[in-house]
Amino acid sequence: MLLSRFTSVFPRNVIVRGVSTLTSHVDRNYLVRSSFDKCQRFPFSDSKQEAEDVKKKCEEAAAKKKCAEAAKKEKEAAEKKKCAEAAKKEKEAAEKKKCAEAAKKEQEAAQKKKCAELAKKEKEAAEKKKCAEAAKKEKEAAERKKCEEAAFKQKCEEAAKKKKEAKKAAELQQKCAALAKKEKEAEMMKKCEEAAKKKAAEEAAKKKAEEVAAKKKADEAAAKKKCAEAKKKAEEAALKKMCEEAALKKMCEEAALQKKCAEAAKNAKKTDSET
């Protein structure tokens, strides 16, 4: 009823224009054209049934459009959600990958640090071993040098001792030679004196027999005295020689004992160093 009044008041082209505004589909004859598949072109009718059909179809078309838009929005929302979830998963995967790479780098750095520390310790151990070997070699060289110096010192001491002994022996020999020379000179002098006395006695015997006899007695007494003195001197010289020989023997014994003590001390020192 209301629709018939509405159609009777407004011209057909106005109503069609109004419907076209709602549906957005109008042909050149001002006929409504639905955008849905089930809507067909139809001429505008003044009848109530046709108006209701049009209204119903328009409402259905609007509902379908609204449903399509809602479905589209839901689809877009689902797509957005799906994309967001995919992006989130990609982001999480990237974060995991980043964390894994960081952990790998940290592990590699720790391994490198550990290897470097191990290499450093090995290097320090090698240097310590090298230093210990060098110190041992230096100690051995010092001990060898010390032994060589001790041996050289002992050799020098022995040479000096031999030289000193040779000098003493030469001095003793010289003294003995001088003493023998003095004894020989004394004996020669005695012989000369005896010859002179004999000659004088013979000459005096020619002059005075009594004087010769008396002088002979005096000469014999003097000769006895001189012989006693010479004998005494010879005994003193022999005693002196004996004392010098005893002193030399004692000196040689002391030198041998000193050498023996030095060898014993050297052997004891060598035994201590070996232990």
UniProtKB/Swiss-Prot annotation:
**Main subcellular localisation:** cytoplasm
Q: What is this protein called?
A: Axoneme-associated protein mst101(3)
Subcellular localization, per the record? Answer: Cytoplasm
Organism per entry:
Drosophila hydei (Fruit fly)
Q: Explain the purpose of this protein.
A: Possible structural role in the sperm tail.
Instruction: State if Transmembrane helix is listed as a keyword.
Output: no
Tissue specificity remark: Testis.
Q: Where is this region: 12 X 16 AA tandem repeats of [KRA]-K-[KEM]-[CKA]-[AEKD]-[EA]-[ALE]-[AMK]-[FKAML]-[KQA]-[EQKA]-[KQCEM]-[ECLA]-[AEQ]-[AEQ]-[EQAKV]?
A: 64-264
Stretches forming sequence repeats: 64-79, 80-95, 96-111, 112-127, 128-143, 144-159, 160-175, 181-196, 197-212, 215-230, 231-246, 249-264
User: Some GO term, biological process aspect, for this entry: which one?
Assistant: sperm individualization
Instruction: Quote the cellular component terms of the Gene Ontology held in the record.
Output: cytoplasm
Alphabetized UniProt keyword annotations: Cytoplasm, Repeat
